[in-house]
Amino acid sequence: MSAIRYELIKTDKQTGARLGKIHTPHGTFDTPMFMPVGTLATVKTMSPEELKAMGAGIILSNTYHLWLRPGEELIREAGGLHKFMNWDQPILTDSGGFQVFSLSKMRDIKEEGVHFRNHLNGDKLFLSPEKAIQIQNALGSDIMMSFDECPPYPASHEYMKKSVERTSRWAERGLQAHARPEDQGLFGIVQGGAYEDLRAQSAKDLVSLDFPGYSIGGLSVGEPKDVMNRVLEHTTPLLPANKPRYLMGVGSPDSLIDGVIRGVDMFDCVLPTRIARNGTCMTSSGRLVIKNAKFTHDFRPIDENCDCYTCKNYSRAYIRHLIRCEETFGIRLTTYHNLHFLLNLMKQVRSAIMEDRLADFREEFFEQYGFNRPDAKNF
C-alpha cells in the first residue's frame, strides 16, 4: 500500500481546478497548497509553530543541502527529519537534481549518475538515482522525488529527447531502490522542456511506472509565462486524476492561480522568503519594496487587507527602519507576511473552487494586484 493517497473533493465548474486532500504518514493537508521551503531543515527565520499558525500544511526540505550539511546519517540518528527539526506534519524532499545542475559549475552527466563539484568547497561528488533515494530514505520525508536531469531553457529538441529518456530510466532505477514505499511516497518528475511531444513521452513513461504522485519539472527556469501555461495545459491531462500533481519551483501569485486552473495541486518556491530578506513584500495591491524612501513616515501596515502577525502589529516605517539597518527581526516580519500572504491566497483559491468561481476570483485578484496593467511589476 502506498504511503500517499490523494482524495478529490470537488472540481471547479468554471475551470476544472481541483480541490482535494493528500493523506500522508504525518497527517493530511488540503490542496491546492503552497509549500514553504526549508532548505536546511528550517524555513529561514520561522519557527515550526509560526508555520503551523499561518496554515502551512506541509513544508519542503532540500536533499542536496542536507546531504552536505549535516549529512543524512546524522539526521537518521536523530530519528529522521521530522524529529530533527521538531516538525510533526508532512515533509516533502526534492531529489537534489536541481541543485546539482544549478549550483555546480563543473558536472559530468553519465548514465550511472552525475559527477560534480561540491559548491561549498570544490570536493568531487557523485549523485545517482539510487543515492538520491537512499539519502531521502534516511531523511524519512513523507514525499520523495525521483532523481532527474534538469536541462536549461532553452535546450534543443535533440538534447531534450535524450534527457527525457535518461530521466525515465533514472526514475525506474529510483523506484527499484526505494526501501520504504509504505512509509514514504515517491513521485516521478515529468520533464521535456517546452516540447509537447517530449512532455507527452515523459508523462507516458512515468505513468507506466505507477508512481503515487507526479511532479512537473523543468518550468519556471526562464521561459515566458505563456509557455509555462501552455506546457501545463498539455501535460496535466496526461497525468492520472487520482494522483497528486506538483509544479516545482513556482511561487509568484499569478503563477499559483494559473497553475491551479490548469490542474496542479502542489507548489513550492523560495520566492516569498528570498525576496522578504531584501525587503520586498507581496500585498493584495501588488509588490511593495519596503526600503523605498516613500515609506519613511508611513505608519500603515504592509497590507491593510492582511491580518497576519506582522500587519496587525507593525508599521511600514518601522519595518523599513529594521530592513535598512539589517536587523534580523525585520527579515522575520517580512518573511512572516509573505508566507502568510501566499498561504492565505491558496486558502482563498480553495474557497473559490468550492464555490465554483475560480475564474471570477482570478479576474478580481489580477485586477486588484495590478497584473492587468501594462506596467505590471512581478517578482
Curated annotation (Swiss-Prot):
Enzyme class: transferase
Reactions it catalyzes: 7-aminomethyl-7-carbaguanine + guanosine(34) in tRNA = 7-aminomethyl-7-carbaguanosine(34) in tRNA + guanine
This protein's record includes keyword tRNA processing: yes
Cofactor mode of binding and number, as noted: Binds 1 zinc ion per subunit.
GO BP: any one term: queuosine biosynthetic process
Pathway: tRNA modification; tRNA-queuosine biosynthesis
Any one of the GO CC terms: cytosol
Keywords, alphabetical: Glycosyltransferase, Metal-binding, Queuosine biosynthesis, Transferase, tRNA processing, Zinc
A molecular-function term among this protein's GO annotations: metal ion binding
EC annotation from Swiss-Prot or TrEMBL: 2.4.2.29
Active site: residue positions: D94 (proton acceptor), D268 (nucleophile)
SUPFAM superfamilies the UniProt entry points to: tRNA-guanine transglycosylase
Swiss-Prot/TrEMBL cofactor(s): Zn(2+)
Start and end residues of each stretch annotated as RNA binding: 249-255, 273-277
Binding sites annotated in the UniProt record for substrate: D94, S95, G96, G97, F98, D148, Q191, G218
Positions of Zn(2+) binding: C306, C308, C311, H337
Subunit field text: Homodimer. Within each dimer, one monomer is responsible for RNA recognition and catalysis, while the other monomer binds to the replacement base PreQ1.
Stored PANTHER family: QUEUINE TRNA-RIBOSYLTRANSFERASE (PTHR46499:SF1)
NCBIfam families per record: Q_tRNA_tgt (TIGR00430), tgt_general (TIGR00449)
Biological role: Catalyzes the base-exchange of a guanine (G) residue with the queuine precursor 7-aminomethyl-7-deazaguanine (PreQ1) at position 34 (anticodon wobble position) in tRNAs with GU(N) anticodons (tRNA-Asp, -Asn, -His and -Tyr). Catalysis occurs through a double-displacement mechanism. The nucleophile active site attacks the C1' of nucleotide 34 to detach the guanine base from the RNA, forming a covalent enzyme-RNA intermediate. The proton acceptor active site deprotonates the incoming PreQ1, allowing a nucleophilic attack on the C1' of the ribose to form the product.
Family: Belongs to the queuine tRNA-ribosyltransferase family.
Name under which the protein is recorded: Queuine tRNA-ribosyltransferase
Species of provenance: Listeria welshimeri serovar 6b (strain ATCC 35897 / DSM 20650 / CCUG 15529 / CIP 8149 / NCTC 11857 / SLCC 5334 / V8)
Upper classification of the organism: Bacteria, Bacillati, Bacillota, Bacilli, Bacillales
